[in-house]
Amino acid sequence: MKIYNTYSRQLEDFQPIEPGKVKMYVCGPTVYNYIHVGNARSVVAFDLVRKYLEFRGFEVEYISNFTDVDDKIIKAAVSENISTKELSERYIAAFYEDTDLLNVKRASQNPKATEFIEAMIDFIQELLDKDYAYISEGDVYFRVAKSKNYAKLANKNLADLLAGASGRTDEETNLKESPADFALWKSVKADEVSWQAPWGAGRPGWHIECSVMSTSLLGETIDIHGGGADLEFPHHTNEIAQSEAKTGQKFVNYWMHNGFVNVDGEKMSKSLGNFTTVHELLQVVDPQILRFFLATTHYRRPLNFTDDALTEAENNIKKIENAYRHLDDQAESNLSALTTFRNDFVAAMDEDFNIANGMTVFYDFVSWVNKGNGGAEVKAFFDQVLEILGIKFEIEQSLDSEIEAMIEARQLAREVRDFAKSDEIRDALKAQGIVLEDTKDGVRWHRE
């Protein structure tokens, strides 16, 4: 199995630290609003990665955090005249509601930043003791100049970053030894939530939160760290700098970053105002359709959010569901063909989780099933791929029996040339969203 490592900019053989086990951390949402489709892309992309690793036999410890203390949360809470805790808890609940509908497997743990404040203070103190950090008027900053290979992850160099920051005159920059230094701790402002630290009251910076939560729960070195491409710099870059400064160990072995969701050629984001929340979209779009749309493009490629793309996803799901509903798990099939499908699917997915190539194989498999191939092993592979994709088809046996009875009655009407009765039954089924398809092997049905 190979993974494209953002740090090295190349495909690398995947070798977990502990054979058979994967320690995986994915940056979660800042909980001040509903997640939008771009946020959901990251959630679904790494859910698919996790599920495929489990399909391949790995035991995955999957951690994804909630940032529940942040400038945006404070601002939103003030505007509603509620506490930051009340606001963040509301949107954590909404996150679970949305992602459950998208059939995202719950993380092994979802730590909240506010649960690790004491550990963050200890982490910062170690950086101060090692002279990687300094205090400036109650704030604590990281000395970027002491970090080896700083910004290699983002393919940048420190000289360029310093040149780009040289014209800044904001208040925070004046507190720093260097414009590139970043905040580990922010001193308390009036009426803000804060915690007491040896250097004064305040709250942690954004970057320190993920370093502390990930290393506290997974250890000093992690197998896989994921997130959106926009997190390469500065967030993940700063995570590397501060984590490796503290531990002296490599922080992450494989960095993975998903591409953006674009709207009219621009990244979907709250700052641009071109976003659609998952909460509002799922009022009008079936969760399976959104899940399929997000899951079936290779995670590193950009994804264009359009009505046509959602319609295509819906049509593809219908084709897959139709094959699944009519798969006879008692039938006999050429198992060598099944082995070829399985091997080809694994070969595609083993190449950096290339679901696009995997879907090409899967669509060929679906066509093969539609030709009458079936059996228990065929159904088992079908179920495995659906699990990786995060798609579930509810087979309602009582309703299916009723439909089959109506189809049988229609067939009897056709045999006695009672076409009026036949058409009446067809129309009744269509009114229930059931479409009949006459084939040489008999009548099939599927949902509209």
From Swiss-Prot:
UniProt-annotated binding residues for ATP: K270
GO CC terms in record: cytosol
Transmembrane segment boundaries: none
Binding site for Zn(2+): C27, C210, H235, E239
Renumbered ranges of motif 'KMSKS' region: 267-271
Protein name: Cysteine--tRNA ligase
Pfam family, one: DALR_2
SUPFAM superfamilies per record: Anticodon-binding domain of a subclass of class I aminoacyl-tRNA synthetases, Nucleotidylyl transferase
Family: Belongs to the class-I aminoacyl-tRNA synthetase family.
Gene, per the UniProt record: cysS
Compartments it resides in: Cytoplasm
Cofactor(s) required, per the database record: Zn(2+)
